[in-house]
Amino acid sequence: MLILQAGGTITTRDAAGRLIPALSPRTGEAGQASASALRFYTEFADPSKEDYTWNRARAEAMKAFASGDLALYIGYASEQPLLSRMNPNLNYAIASVPQIRNAARTINGGRAYAFATPRTTKNPVGAVTVAYLLSTAESSQALAQALGIPSARRDILNQPVTGYDELFNKQAIIARAWLDPDPKKTESIFQAMIENTTSGTLLLTEAITRADQEMGQILGL
């Protein structure tokens, strides 16, 4: 999300329509979104910085927040029920995600899932029909209510709601995302990029370049 707020992205499409990594600027491109975001993020793990608040000895963020040892946790709306189960007595409030000062536009991060029909499916018409029915306004609203998450449809998000659902819906409207080729592998890539930076194993720009190259390998480039 920090990279998106800084004006960058993680993957994009080239002139031929292929999905390619975009962590590192290509030849002739300007922009330091990835570097700015990674620098900001990793400074919290740098003992020489005033913002130093994290090290490997600390618990995972959600667990620390649920136990009352962390004052601020940035997560997804879908995590609210889990937090309540982890600590039913936790007293907390939910607010919109912080933004970069003087940013041109407000950006939030979100996870979006889509239906896809394999080319080898034996019943393509049936598969497309099911996908269509599940994406209707009625189905989308029912799924959102059942799962406790915002709908992916703007017409549903614009309907009047109460409580935190109003905040969640507003945040969903400004949410931005990127095409993730393999969530588990990309999570490992980002973790390695962060650890390579905080440990001093690689320079910040080198860590980004390596992550960009590893992302390219996932995409078969």
Question: Where are the regions a protein language model picked out?
Answer:
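Glycine-centered hinge/linker elements that transmit conformational signals in sensory
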Residues: 14-54
